[in-house]
């Protein structure tokens, strides 16, 4: 038995999503998703721009969709069935919320008569994600009222555009009652009236800065690339740029590794700026913000979400894009001050232990390689030693900074790149999202998964709890004793174990099709000792 009303309204929902810029869908199959999933599969055959991925693990699916949205900078839909399945999207929705990514959750639901009376696979899904999804709507696709279809067309476009404009996730809840089968190969013509939203650009008076010792701090950036405009401004006005590894602006013309420079006491009074103009999100290096506070350096924050400053040290916030800000900024910086900062990049960077992997990647990666970096030590090491010798696309989940979902997000990212991608991760992070590797196998994604295997959580060895010798290994070190060769075997991917980072270049030069797992082993205690020796070496240079 088929439902004509359900068929028509489902088509309108999918067409309205497409009219709003949605082209990529990640589906976690379940009984209640039946009408949406089937109509979507049919729509994919009819429209070459529609791409559908199937991920049977909802937690992985949420992050896979996030990876596509993060890389493409466009909304992506994840579709799931009712009950606890939908709750598995929560971690990805949380990351999308804080990272300002327009992730759209289509949550199929049980109808009203099955709510709150013990029906199986049923829970309250109305605004299930709470404040994490500022935008929410519930559509009754089986309602025959003539205004309902127009409502679906309008509200879908309105809310998707709102989610895109603000960089926020959206939940569309779909209560469905049986029969769930749509009418396939339906000839009903769907016509969507496009809803156009025009952004207004506010022009303000030129921003004149009288200070002559100004530094720009380019933080993590999930929005449009402004690297060319930033570097041109830096050259024209002699303003040094500290570029975070996730700023999309790091090159050999920008300052890198500031965390280690501060730690080694390189930034003496002659480097002290009168003003720091900060773009983007919170820098990977916490030490940079601590330095600004300690030195009481005035900070202006420029971002579409300016004012989100946990350091509470920002003195002036501009809610605008960096590009718009730079076009209105007038200043004359001190040339000697600029040159002094630029010379910081001449200081030798000694990469030891686990950081040697990031250093080697900096030397060997081809232009425009997409690299996803796990949190904890991997992203910190990358921020410290990756100079931006060539233009790379570096990504990470630095919204909530969790280690879950990293594999799936990286795999979503890899679907966008035309060349092989890289995931740099630790063994603990890989374990957290091992299910995600099924997508690499299923779609034969071209990605090299480089696992820094220190048998546990390396970052805790740098923290005070490492002194609690009696309890540390069980409570924080958490050795997993995973055999990575068996992980690779489980997902039918080539496996290579390297003795050190030096062999990475030759390894990556051997091209393969599909995913590949590369393991490099390190000892956690030796890694800590190496970092301490390196700090002493830097302090004496």
Swiss-Prot record:
Keyword annotations of the record: Magnesium, Manganese, Menaquinone biosynthesis, Metal-binding, Thiamine pyrophosphate, Transferase
Source species, domain of life: Bacteria
Pfam families referenced in this protein's UniProt entry, alphabetically: TPP_enzyme_C (PF02775), TPP_enzyme_M_2 (PF16582), TPP_enzyme_N (PF02776)
Catalytic activity: isochorismate + 2-oxoglutarate + H(+) = 5-enolpyruvoyl-6-hydroxy-2-succinyl-cyclohex-3-ene-1-carboxylate + CO2
EC number: 2.2.1.9
Keyword Magnesium recorded: yes
InterPro entries with a match to the protein in the record: MenaQ_synth_MenD, MenD_middle, THDP-binding, Thiamin_PyroP_enz_TPP-bd_dom, TPP_enzyme_TPP-bd
Pathway(s) served: Quinol/quinone metabolism; 1,4-dihydroxy-2-naphthoate biosynthesis; 1,4-dihydroxy-2-naphthoate from chorismate: step 2/7; Quinol/quinone metabolism; menaquinone biosynthesis
Cofactor note: Binds 1 thiamine pyrophosphate per subunit.
A GO biological process held by the record: menaquinone biosynthetic process
UniProt cofactor(s): Mg(2+); Mn(2+); thiamine diphosphate
Enzyme class: transferase
SUPFAM superfamilies, per database record: Thiamin diphosphate-binding fold (THDP-binding) (SSF52518)
Any GO molecular function: 2-succinyl-5-enolpyruvyl-6-hydroxy-3-cyclohexene-1-carboxylic-acid synthase activity
Family stated for the protein in its record: Belongs to the TPP enzyme family. MenD subfamily.
Subunit record text: Homodimer.
Function: Catalyzes the thiamine diphosphate-dependent decarboxylation of 2-oxoglutarate and the subsequent addition of the resulting succinic semialdehyde-thiamine pyrophosphate anion to isochorismate to yield 2-succinyl-5-enolpyruvyl-6-hydroxy-3-cyclohexene-1-carboxylate (SEPHCHC).
Name of the protein in question: 2-succinyl-5-enolpyruvyl-6-hydroxy-3-cyclohexene-1-carboxylate synthase
């Amino acid at each position: 038995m088929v439902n004509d009303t359900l068929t028509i309204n489902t088509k309108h929902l999918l067409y309205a999503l497409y009219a709003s810029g949605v082209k990529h869908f990640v589906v976690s199959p379940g009984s209640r998703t039946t009408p949406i999933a089937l109509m979507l599969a049919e729509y994919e055959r009819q429209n070459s721009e529609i791409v559908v991925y199937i991920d049977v693990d909802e937690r992985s699916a949420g992050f896979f969709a996030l990876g596509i949205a993060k890389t493409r900078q466009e909304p992506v839909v994840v579709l799931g069935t009712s009950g606890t399945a939908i709750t598995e999207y929560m971690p990805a929705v949380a990351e999308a919320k804080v990272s300002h990514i327009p992730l759209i959750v289509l949550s199929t639901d049980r109808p009203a008569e099955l709510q709150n009376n013990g029906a199986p696979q049923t829970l309250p899904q109305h605004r299930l994600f709470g404040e994490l999804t500022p935008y929410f709507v519930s559509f009754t696709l089986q309602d025959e009222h003539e205004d309902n279809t127009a409502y679906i067309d309008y509200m879908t476009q309105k809310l998707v555009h709102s989610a895109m404009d603000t960089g926020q996730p959206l939940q569309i809840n779909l209560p469905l009652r049986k029969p769930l089968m749509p009418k396939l190969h339906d000839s009903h013509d769907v016509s969507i009236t496009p809803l156009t939203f025009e952004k207004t650009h506010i022009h303000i008076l030129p921003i004149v800065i009288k200070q002559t010792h100004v530094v720009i701090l380019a933080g993590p950036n999930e929005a449009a690339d402004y690297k060319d405009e930033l570097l041109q401004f830096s050259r024209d006005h002699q303003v040094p740029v500290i570029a975070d590894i996730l700023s999309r602006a790091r090159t050999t013309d920008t300052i890198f590794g500031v965390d280690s420079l501060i730690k080694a006491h390189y930034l003496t009074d002659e480097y002290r700026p009168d003003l720091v103009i900060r773009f983007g999100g919170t820098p990977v290096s916490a030490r940079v913000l601590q330095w600004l506070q300690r030195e009481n350096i005035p900070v202006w924050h420029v971002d579409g979400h300016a004012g989100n400053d946990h350091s509470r040290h920002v003195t002036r916030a501009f809610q605008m894009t960096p590009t718009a800000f730079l076009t209105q900024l007038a200043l004359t910086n001190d040339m000697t001050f600029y040159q002094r900062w630029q010379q910081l990049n001449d200081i030798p960077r000694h990469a030891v232990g686990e950081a040697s992997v990031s250093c080697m990647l900096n030397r060997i990666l081809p232009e425009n390689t997409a690299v996803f970096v796990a949190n904890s030590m991997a992203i910190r090491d990358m921020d410290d030693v990756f100079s931006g010798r060539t233009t790379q696309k570096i990504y990470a989940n630095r919204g909530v900074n969790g280690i879950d979902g990293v594999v799936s997000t990286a795999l979503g990212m890899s679907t966008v790149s035309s060349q092989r991608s890289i995931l740099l991760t630790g063994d603990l992070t890989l374990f957290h999202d091992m299910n995600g590797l099924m997508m690499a196998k299923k779609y034969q994604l071209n990605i090299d998964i480089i696992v820094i295997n220190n048998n546990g959580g390396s970052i805790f060895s740098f923290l005070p709890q490492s002194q609690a010798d009696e309890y540390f290994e069980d409570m924080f070190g958490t050795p997993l004793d995973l055999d990575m060769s068996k992980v690779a075997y489980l997902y039918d991917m080539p496996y290579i174990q390297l003795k050190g980072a030096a062999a990475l270049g030759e390894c990556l030069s051997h091209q393969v099709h599909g995913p590949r797992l590369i393991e490099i082993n390190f000892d956690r205690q030796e890694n800590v000792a190496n970092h301490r020796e390196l700090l002493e070496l830097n302090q004496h240079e």
